[in-house]
């Protein structure tokens, strides 16, 4: 019996493996897909993840299951989905906070947003709203600044943790307006907003999507928002830009990312499904209601977007002195 040369056997094995891998990619998804959310239930990231999971389940004919893994300012959950096999069955909710803020603020984050991930799909961005407990009597930015100078009054703002997007926006707003406020970090957005409504803290800098139910219920006063222009669902809420603060424009964005090495075909399929979900009348209505701004980006465009955001926010973090502030 004549045996084929070793090189032939190796080539045949490589072809077999490549064919098997291609077949697995074509069959994807043939079992439930996990979306790891590095935040507690109830916040903007969690809500968006569940909305997207519902649409992906419908369009890709397989269950997309949200699992919350909060802690460490988003580091715990982010590192968990980063450590999963790059087979498309475990992806994660990424965000401005976990990609552009935490790795700069926390010297021990342990991951590189530009080189360790497959960035899949941008979902949407929510402007941040400066909100006040009504008992402060603060309704305008001028009143906010005046309140900060009132002797004997507690002046605190809540965020969802040290190094969170809420903290950074709060620090930026304080820096831009020349006020000094004490930061009160919480473990979850829902808990912080509950304490704000109860009057345990005076102000907050959360996303409009998280704060909107309280604004509609008049249990919080909206002072100004970081959107580039007034939102159609909140026409009475002024922008910082129109109030003379053009440096306070931007959104807290949310997206899907996965472990480096994911199949380009799977990445593109998820990206296209997310874009289709956002473009549906139901998706657009939900985004308008919650104050979320959509931006259609393919996977390559989103990857470049993340890199640009990292450069932009590093300079802002340096400005407020938070680079490497957390260990």
PLM feature spans:
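Hinge/capping helix and adjacent helix->loop/strand transition within the periplasmic-binding protein
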Residues: 83-89, 96, 104-191, 240, ...
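Bacterial N-terminal signal peptides that target proteins for export
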Residues: 1-12
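C-terminal lobe and pocket-closing loops
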Residues: 125, 211-279, 308-311, 325-327
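N-terminal (or domain-start) structured segment
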Residues: 24-115, 153-154, 162, 177-202, ...
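Immediate post-signal peptide segment of exported/extracytoplasmic ligand-binding proteins
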Residues: 23-35, 84-90, 145-156, 216-217, ...
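Surface-exposed aromatic
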Residues: 286-305
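N-terminal signal peptide c-region/cleavage motif recognized by signal peptidases
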Residues: 18-21
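A ligand-binding cleft/hinge motif common to bilobed small-molecule-binding domains
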Residues: 99-108, 172-176, 203-237, 314
């Amino acid at each position: 019996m004549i045996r084929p040369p070793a090189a032939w056997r190796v080539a045949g094995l490589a072809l077999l493996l490549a064919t098997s891998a291609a077949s697995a990619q074509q069959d994807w998804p043939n079992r439930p897909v996990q979306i790891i959310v590095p935040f507690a239930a109830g916040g903007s990231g969690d809500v968006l993840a569940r909305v997207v999971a519902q649409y992906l389940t419908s369009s890709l004919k397989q269950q997309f299951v949200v699992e919350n893994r909060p802690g460490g300012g988003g580091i715990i959950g982010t590192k968990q989905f980063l450590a999963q096999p790059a087979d498309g069955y475990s992806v994660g909710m990424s965000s401005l906070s976990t990609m552009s803020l935490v790795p700069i603020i926390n010297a021990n984050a342990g991951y590189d947003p530009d080189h360790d991930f497959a960035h899949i799909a941008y979902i949407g961005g929510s402007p941040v709203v400066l909100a006040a407990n009504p008992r402060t009597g603060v309704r305008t930015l001028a009143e906010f600044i005046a309140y900060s100078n009132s002797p004997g009054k507690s002046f605190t703002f809540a965020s969802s943790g040290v190094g969170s997007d809420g903290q950074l926006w709060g620090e930026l707003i304080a820096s831009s307006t020349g006020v000094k406020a004490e930061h009160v970090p919480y473990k979850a957005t829902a808990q912080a907003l509950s304490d704000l409504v109860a009057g345990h803290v005076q102000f907050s800098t959360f996303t409009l999507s998280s704060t909107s139910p309280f604004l509609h219920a008049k249990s919080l006063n909206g002072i100004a928002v970081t959107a580039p222009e007034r939102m159609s669902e909140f026409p009475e809420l002024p922008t910082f830009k129109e109030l003379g603060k053009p440096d306070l424009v931007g959104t807290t964005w949310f997206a899907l990312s996965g472990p480096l090495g994911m199949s380009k075909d799977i990445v593109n399929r998820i990206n296209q499904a997310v874009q289709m979900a956002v473009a549906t009348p139901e998706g657009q209505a939900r985004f308008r209601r919650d104050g979320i701004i959509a931006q259609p980006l393919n996977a390559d465009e989103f990857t470049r977007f993340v890199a640009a955001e990292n450069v932009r926010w590093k300079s802002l973090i340096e400005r407020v002195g938070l680079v490497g502030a957390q260990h």
